[in-house]
Amino acid sequence: MPLAAAQDLRAYNLQTASVARTGADLLRLLTAGFTAKAPSIEPIHAQLSAKWAGEPAAGKLIRAALVLCADHELNASTFTVRCVASTRATPYGAVMAGLAALQGPRHGGQTARVAALFDEVAAADSPEAAVAARMRRGERLPGFGHILYPDGDPRCQLLRRLLTTALGSNPELAMAVELAAAATENTGLQPNVDFSLVMLQRSLNLPETAPMGIFAIGRCAGWIAHAQEQYAHPELIRPRARYVGEQPQLARD
């Protein structure tokens, strides 16, 4: 991406139409990174499905997941993108900053921890046993709970319904449903979007990189829209901070 940014002089044009063109190029480039193919104008969900899946229903399900990941107001990565865009960095710079934030284990990188939990469940006697083992060790259950959705993440709920309708009796999906039920019963926490992306990956037998790939590509579309909006405002995003630590000792003669 840095190499493409250096060669794309149009990216320095921050007018709305130009940012839209650059954003489309960025989405194709990011998709190419996950498909290991040249950038293409084919629909993104079709590219990912052709590379990743053999399941006929995969394309529509991947498309739904991309849409569900596209925007979620001012999460950490999107706020980062808007801050960078406010400096008048190019869309490449804004998106690369967003990707850096997204990969953190408390953001999109959480999907790797959810995948590890799924592996534990697959190796355990039952989902309940895996949940109990985590709880006895005093460990969190990744993929559960969201500060905005104490009653359940609607993105996860929708993707689960779509998977159930499309796949019916799928063993990986059944395991995910049992895991969610066991975790919610014992913690009161509902599964979130990170859980649903791993549930999708396991149910469709997609590669391990798929959850993060879908999250990053889907969210990139939202980042471009946020950057477009930010470029239209002249203000630099500059929050203030107030020092609340110990006061330095005054020097004595």
Language model: regions and residue ranges:
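Hydrophobic alpha-helical bundle cores within soluble ligand-binding/oligomerization subdomains
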Residues: 1-253
